[in-house]
Amino acid sequence: MCVAILTPDPNEKFQTMFDAGQAAAFMQLAAWELGVGSCPASLYEFDKARAILGFPVEWHLRIALSFGYALEEEKLSAPPKKGGRMLLEEVVHWEKWG
């Protein structure tokens, strides 16, 4: 399943992008509680998206979410793998830069 999140023109009111992001995040959290995974996507070919979905020109599509079940259910509850992330101390600055 895919959900397209439409907003008024984000160039006129920037907070619409924040609101769209919040909506996306809460949909993802709600889905996760039901055992459904999700993946957000940013869209860059706006005219193609409008042609495919047929939404009015005064609305803008910037975020799409795909939802589905994992192929292997144990992957949903698997502990996160240790990756090549930087240490917190390397990316966080307290009270001042540096």
Residue ranges and their predicted role:
Residues 1-98:
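Acidic, surface-exposed loops and disordered segments
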